[in-house]
Amino acid sequence: SQLFMSTVFDDVAFAPRNYGMSEAEVNEKTMEALKVVHIEQLKDKQIYKLSGGEKKLASIATILSTEPDVILMDEPSVALDPKNRRNLINILNRLNQAKIIASHDLNMIMDTCERTILLSDGKIIKDGNTKEILLDKELMEESGLELPLGY
């Protein structure tokens, strides 16, 4: 959640402005990205006044303002309360972009990913259907992991 401008709007608008878009295009892309993550009401809020969940959503809006084909995320659900975690999952599931997510939050992975690549000691152990991999008790134990909660 790296934010460095003074307001949410300015942070989300940073990339479009640096891409040389007109101010009208910048405003359109920025507001569109804020709406996708449901934080348009925070556009004028100072970055330092945001909660952890709001910072995550602002960071995702910043990414979306660039209209990427692929989004890379490292532990996106860490330090989120249950409500913001569920909100993040719902947002990720609505995004059309390909998502590459590194996470130890196996329940979030179950809820958001069709395909999983399981790594251990920097090596690919298994690549395939998320549910098949994460519900394989023997594989998970061999990899030093536990089954997702509730399974």
Predicted regions and their residues:
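A short, surface-exposed alpha-helical micro-motif characterized by mixed small hydrophobic
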Residues: 109-111
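Catalytic Walker B motif of ABC-type/P-loop ATPase nucleotide-binding domains
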Residues: 71-74
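Conserved ABC ATPase signature
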Residues: 46-50, 54
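Conserved beta-strand-loop-alpha-helix hinge in the C-terminal portion
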Residues: 123-146
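H-loop/switch region of ABC-family ATPase nucleotide-binding domains
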Residues: 103-104
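Hydrophobic anchor residue at the start of the ABC signature
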Residues: 59-60, 88
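Conserved ABC ATPase "signature" region
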Residues: 24-42
